[in-house]
Amino acid sequence: GTILSRVGWFSMMILVGGLLASCDSTVRQIGKSSTESSPVVQTERREKHTDHTYGFTVKYYPKEYVLLTDSPIQTATQPSAVQRVRFQRKDLATGQVVDHEPPGLMISVFERSPERLLHEWLDSSGLVPPGSEISSVRLTGVKEGLRVTLRQQPAPNEFVYLANDQYVYSLVPYDAQGGKMLRSFRLLPDSSRAHMRH
């Protein structure tokens, strides 16, 4: 009689154990999925920056980046930019050395004469260093688009130039997030631009 009761007791314990285990796993699953999905949503939340004067929009991550615009006076580059927008990491943007820290993405706008082809303009501006790989880029509203890649060089080693009748837009990503922001760049249709003051 004792063997039977012992077997019965064992099977009872197995049953109870099994029930507890299955309850535990469902609780764990519910908890797991809710914690997994929430942080992803927060980091991916992007805001759109729209520049009506120069006719473009770009999405960025406001939690991580701050948008800084340089006045044309500050942009002592050749050729000289009429507008420059930098997306700087927030932890770097507060310091004194903000101008020396690379941004996530830099967008520069240059005026262009429409009769010149984009690659001629890049060449004459010294923006195609030796060893550059050049490929074409397509985007709505863009007449010509070129990507200049320098594989031998550390970042920034990718430069995207997009041209319409009035401007050349230069986009330079410095990191992976900058690359994502670059891919969100769009030109505004003519109707939604502010009319240029000449």
Describe the function of each predicted region:
Residues D24-T26:
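Bacterial signal peptide processing site
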Residues I30, T69-K180, S191:
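Conserved polar/disulfide-associated segments of primarily extracytoplasmic proteins
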Residues G31-A81, T140, H198:
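N-terminal "mature-domain start" segment
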Residues G1-S11:
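Bacterial N-terminal signal peptides that target proteins for export
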Residues L20-S22:
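C-terminal motif of bacterial Sec signal peptides marking the signal peptidase cleavage site
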Residues G178-H198:
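Short, low-complexity, Pro/Ser/Thr/Gly-rich segments in the mature regions of secreted, periplasmic
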